[in-house]
Amino acid sequence: MPEFVTFSRNVFIPVTNICRNLCGYCTFRRDAGHPEAHLMSMSEIRPILERGEKAGCTEALFVFGEYAEEVPEYLLELEKLGYSTTVEYVADLCKLAIEIGLLPHTNAGILNRKELEILKPLNISMGLMLETTAELKAHSESPGKKPSTRIEMIRTAGKLKIPFTTGILVGIGETKDDRKRSLNTIADIHKEFGHIQEVIIQNFMPKPDTPMADHAPPSKEEMIDTVAIAREILPSDVAVQVAPNLIDPYSLIKAGASDLGGISPTTIDWINPEAEWPDVIELQKMIKEIELRERLPIYPQHIKKGWYSNNLSYLIETLTDKNGFKRKQR
């Protein structure tokens, strides 16, 4: 059992749910003509960030559908906001978050090297789920879920020294050997570049009105087994993360998990909207006798390495304690 388990406090901003991919399990994505399709404006986003900062959050999690620019209707909406590319808009949203006092973490799907270089100075960390190295039916209509494409981006982030979150999705048609291959791929990338902070072991949850609505989720035993395999395969400086709003974490902590990810006191989980976040008191009850320790969206080892830009130095100095974790409020 670990001495302590970590989490971060975030505000979850679903900037757009328009996406070029059509994954078999996703309820986040909307077609451009759907009444729930959106591109949030800065005036909508600012008060959400401000509420999060007042609630003690340290992370602004910006989530996007992938390459929405491929959808003409989205481009028109983006141009109304005064931008020609999503990355330009993300950069300004990150600046806004920093101004308010939050550390940006962007997960926008596939980004090329130039786009990562633009966002690196304005993000404390970034993320992209590998999901799996297997070619699956669930991803047959999702060009951005091609394993080689995702691996290339994770490697590019390593070359640029961007602290990074990735992970696998368990139960979408992959085999146990596929999971091992995926985890070994992540481990090899980290051994080369040293940038992967955490690997999420996320359990598939069937959603109504999706092609995989009747697909069974992984059992608790499968999840325990996968976490144990992850802890065995991954280097010791890479945390194994599980989502406490999707599964009871205690047995997974016993198997090797040590992080509970981002928890929001002010926003919902827009990817799994049916799964409410536990609050910090509930989190502590879930993990029983283990110490719960709050971290930032950058891990202490990457703070010590100085893997962040001058744009973020003041917030790092303000928010961290001497060990690189979240400074306790007095």
Swiss-Prot record:
RNA-binding among keywords: no
Pathway listed: Cofactor biosynthesis; coenzyme F0 biosynthesis
Cofactor: [4Fe-4S] cluster
Gene3D superfamilies according to UniProt: Aldolase class I
Alphabetical keyword list: 4Fe-4S, Iron, Iron-sulfur, Lyase, Metal-binding, S-adenosyl-L-methionine
Catalyzed reactions per annotation: 5-amino-5-(4-hydroxybenzyl)-6-(D-ribitylimino)-5,6-dihydrouracil + S-adenosyl-L-methionine = 7,8-didemethyl-8-hydroxy-5-deazariboflavin + 5'-deoxyadenosine + L-methionine + NH4(+) + H(+)
Cofactor detail note: Binds 1 [4Fe-4S] cluster. The cluster is coordinated with 3 cysteines and an exchangeable S-adenosyl-L-methionine.
Residues covered by the Radical SAM core domain: 5-245
Molecular function via GO: 4 iron, 4 sulfur cluster binding; 7,8-didemethyl-8-hydroxy-5-deazariboflavin synthase activity; iron ion binding; transferase activity, transferring alkyl or aryl (other than methyl) groups
Family: Belongs to the radical SAM superfamily. CofG family.
Subunit structure: Consists of two subunits, CofG and CofH.
Physiological role: Catalyzes the radical-mediated synthesis of 7,8-didemethyl-8-hydroxy-5-deazariboflavin from 5-amino-5-(4-hydroxybenzyl)-6-(D-ribitylimino)-5,6-dihydrouracil.
The protein, known as: 7,8-didemethyl-8-hydroxy-5-deazariboflavin synthase
Species, as recorded: Methanococcoides burtonii (strain DSM 6242 / NBRC 107633 / OCM 468 / ACE-M)
